[in-house]
Amino acid sequence: MKNTKTSQEQVIELKLSDRQKKVLKSIVDEYTISATPVSSKLLVQKEFKDQSSATIRNEMMFLEKNGLIEKQHISGGRVPSLKGYDFYNKNLINKNNNVSDNFKMRLHKILSKRYSNIDEILNAAVSIINETTQLPAVVTKTSSDELLKRIDLVKINDNSALVLIVTSSENILTHSIKLDKNTKFNDLQTCFSVLDERLVDTKLSLISSKLDLIVDIVRNKLEEVEYYFSKIVHRVFDFYAYKPNIDSKTYGVKYLTKHSEFEDQQKLNDLLNLLEDSTIWQQIALNKKTDGLAKIMLGNEIGHEHLAIATTQINLANTNHQITVVGPTRMDYAKIKALLDFLKIEIEKILGSTNEH
């Protein structure tokens, strides 16, 4: 019978003894710090002083046979494989990893300041994440549930006008409109004035479905109302009905030079391409599986073999902000996860969350 289990399911099912788990964890932790293949001799010196080198070698052979560690170079040391990192993150990661008092103090200082909006708070917080992890991060803002606070129409010239939409998160969205011979600016302004009166505090994503209810109101004030709604108004708001507003920004790219992996130009290019690929950040931001605490995704999950990401979603009243730390597979997962979890919990606690933990 054909085995249909995925490699991740097989990792979870793999049974290791307590000593084998400790050996694997020691290899991951040591390699994270040193970036050097780990030998049985080193493990005995540091973690297993009451064990012989032969015993630890046998345990390492078992781990290698099961694909959890691998030989990287000619040297006798071993490094974690993707399968090994996956097992580590699911079973061995230190869930009680303490966030430093310095990080807590700096974050609380940011949250106590009177910033104008959440974007400025996150910009300041992510800079601390960059500095602490020595890794870049991507912040993705999804605002499909923003509320309409004001809508206005501004005439640019005889041939064009600009729709201004102010949202509940203080974003100002603009849409340009061409004015042809069949379009009277004053009539169009009447349409948008009624929308401004009737649709305040409506979700942008729902406005398109409510426009038909507004037509009868406008019809009492304006002839040819169907023309203006079908040709112009619907086009403006249909955009929000089908496509949430997603914006991504990258911070801390300068820290890539701190990591030996990126002395390899190909690996550096791979990461830079990932950072510039807006589609993957949109997919992560729209993935509701990241609503909980920090999620770790390895190279085989994101299509980049030598890279990994740790991501968390901060849920506020009308916007979601995805913060994703990006780096080599040899990153300090426990530390990064603890930082992201703390950041999420503190910001949602102070600014208000749409979810409960």
Curated annotation (Swiss-Prot):
It holds the Pfam family HrcA. It comes from the Bacteria. Signal peptide: none annotated. One of its GO terms (molecular function) is DNA binding. Keywords: Repressor, Stress response, Transcription, Transcription regulation. Negative regulator of class I heat shock genes (grpE-dnaK-dnaJ and groELS operons). Prevents heat-shock induction of these operons. NCBIfam families: hrcA. HAMAP family: HrcA (MF_00081). Belongs to the HrcA family. This is Heat-inducible transcription repressor HrcA. It comes from Ureaplasma parvum serovar 3 (strain ATCC 700970). The lineage of its organism: Bacteria, Bacillati, Mycoplasmatota, Mycoplasmoidales, Mycoplasmoidaceae.
